Amino acid sequence: MASNMLSIANPSLRVYNKGFSEFSGLHTSSLPFGRKGSDDLMAFVSFQTNAVGGKRSSQNGVVEAKLKVAINGFGRIGRNFLRCWHGRKDSPLDVVVINDTGGVKQASHLLKYDSILGTFDADVKTAGDSAISVDGKVIKVVSDRNPVNLPWGDMGIDLVIEGTGVFVDRDGAGKHLQAGAKKVLITAPGKGDIPTYVVGVNEEGYTHADTIISNASCTTNCLAPFVKVLDQKFGIIKGTMTTTHSYTGDQRLLDASHRDLRRARAACLNIVPTSTGAAKAVALVLPNLKGKLNGIALRVPTPNVSVVDLVVQVSKKTFAEEVNAAFRESADNELKGILSVCDEPLVSIDFRCTDVSSTIDSSLTMVMGDDMVKVIAWYDNEWGYSQRVVDLADIVANKWQ
């Protein structure tokens, strides 16, 4: 192909492996008992929190005990995680407790009614003053800002889903271990030497010896799978990324003080340029790309769904249709359920509650000359990310020793 030509993909209006809400969190619980009164519910809380075990073993294919899971921080990711987990069949996880400073009434209400996800199609209610019930599944609620004080040891907690965004280094996350938990999964980029795993990219490297792990960021989970495909098929020399990202709770509703002067400005009124470590973090899961990628974020006035714009120089000459074909092949095989390719002319809201980590917008794939590739990928930065947190927690459970 001539070096001054621009190649743009020609979509055939098909959607490959779209994966919208397969695990929508709207399925009913498979627990073998009905809804009961508050006395029975509290008795069940006592049974759950004092049950022996947590380690999983299998005999003739029957799971003898599930991994006992605590959620620390019941915000956007914490509640999305619970909905995603609730929608899974035969999960190896058992969520038994939530640490939430808002208390039982708030935890129950915000789980049931969500401005983005809609009303949870489950029977959600308080169970006394120290638990909530989700389709008869009783989950204890505790409240303490210091993880060291949490009752993880007494409750036999195997895995903590660390969803506050605060305890992201070894010292902070390690407080859960001090409290008696056996492992911690951080739902944010980890700091220091904490192992980082992105499902579909490097999760096979996880071993039971890891006590604290990170699921990386939502943007890294979107970027890494298709970057892996690009590098394997065409060889990435260098590149830059921009994520046009929905605003988050870290921003201000109206102008107010913030350590980042741009994030101090009203989130719903501005396009806010800010930093992101997502591109550099790809090197944590794909070490051969260290130093080859960088990027920024543009926070925009939408509440959910974001989109990555990646431009890379590649070593192998190519054209847009060939790039999309590589994505389709991976989406149908090793990255099935992680990556998808969409040929429809859609907009951000159409990707709300998408289960996959990233959806390639094939009509926007471009190749300038024959070695500069531009790829656009959509992702639900809450729901899709939370599905991967559940996936990684499942891997922890399945590799339990």
Curated annotation (Swiss-Prot):
Top-level taxon: Eukaryota
Cell inner membrane found in the keyword field: no
Result after altering T101A: Reduced affinity for NADP, and slight increase of the affinity for NAD
Matches recorded under InterPro entries: GlycerAld/Erythrose_P_DH, GlycerAld_3-P_DH_AS, GlycerAld_3-P_DH_cat, GlycerAld_3-P_DH_NAD(P)-bd, Glyceraldehyde-3-P_DH_1, NAD(P)-bd_dom_sf
Annotated binding of D-glyceraldehyde 3-phosphate, by residue: S217, C218, T219, T248, R263, T276, G277, R299
Binding site for NADP(+): R76, I77, D100, R145, N381
Transit peptide: 1-65
Gene Ontology biological process terms from the UniProt entry: glucose metabolic process; reductive pentose-phosphate cycle
Location within or outside the cell: Plastid, Chloroplast
GO cellular component entries: chloroplast
Record key words, sorted: Calvin cycle, Chloroplast, NADP, Oxidoreductase, Plastid, Transit peptide
Active site, UniProt feature: C218
Annotated phenotype, changing S257A: Reduced affinity for NADP, and slight increase of the affinity for NAD
Pathway: Carbohydrate biosynthesis; Calvin cycle
GO molecular function: glyceraldehyde-3-phosphate dehydrogenase (NAD+) (phosphorylating) activity; glyceraldehyde-3-phosphate dehydrogenase (NADP+) (phosphorylating) activity; NAD binding; NADP binding
Site (Activates thiol group during catalysis): H245
Swiss-Prot/TrEMBL catalytic activity: D-glyceraldehyde 3-phosphate + phosphate + NADP(+) = (2R)-3-phospho-glyceroyl phosphate + NADPH + H(+)
Pfam families: Gp_dh_C (PF02800), Gp_dh_N (PF00044)
Enzyme Commission numbers on file: 1.2.1.13
Assembly and oligomerization: Tetramer of either four A chains (GAPDH 2) or two A and two B chains (GAPDH 1).
Family: Belongs to the glyceraldehyde-3-phosphate dehydrogenase family.
Anything else known: Plants contain two types of GAPDH: cytosolic forms which participate in glycolysis and chloroplast forms which participate in photosynthesis. All the forms are encoded by distinct genes.
The protein's name: Glyceraldehyde-3-phosphate dehydrogenase A, chloroplastic
Organism: Spinacia oleracea
